[in-house]
């Protein structure tokens, strides 16, 4: 599930679509719903100073449910000339399995987002 920062002058919606394209190559998607609020997590203390470029102890995020209406050959998680790959694999998965696939300190956020967007998920 792509994530990233909001650039200056950019709306959260624009940032979500940009991050989706940067991290997966996907441009054939549309926003269905924006989360009602912001979701946050804190890094475990042993990651302070190293994760998130060493500058932050966690993140506050706005989430979006999107519909992908392209074909799978559009998905490209490989390294780009100006950007290192952020993922080494991808797969479609049913929503109730997603929290188990993510690092433990982000699971609470994933569960909340899945609950909030349940009307769109399988």
Short names for language-model regions:
Residues 1-2:
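A short gly/proline-enriched turn/hairpin at secondary-structure junctions
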Residues 6-104:
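Unchanged
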Residues 95-122:
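Charged phosphate-binding loop/patch that engages nucleotide di/tri-phosphates or the phosphate backbone
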């Amino acid at each position: 599930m792509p994530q990233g920062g909001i650039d200056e002058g950019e709306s959260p919606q624009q940032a979500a679509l940009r991050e989706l394209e940067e991290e997966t190559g996907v441009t054939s998607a549309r926003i269905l719903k924006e989360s009602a609020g912001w979701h946050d997590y804190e890094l475990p203390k042993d990651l302070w100073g190293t994760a998130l470029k060493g500058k932050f102890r966690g993140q506050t995020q706005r989430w979006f449910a999107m519909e992908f209406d392209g074909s799978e050959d559009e998905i490209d998680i490989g390294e780009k000339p100006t950007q290192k790959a952020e993922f080494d694999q991808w797969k479609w998965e049913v929503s109730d399995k997603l929290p188990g696939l993510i690092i433990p300190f982000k699971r609470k956020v994933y569960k909340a987002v899945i609950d909030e967007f349940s009307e769109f998920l399988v």
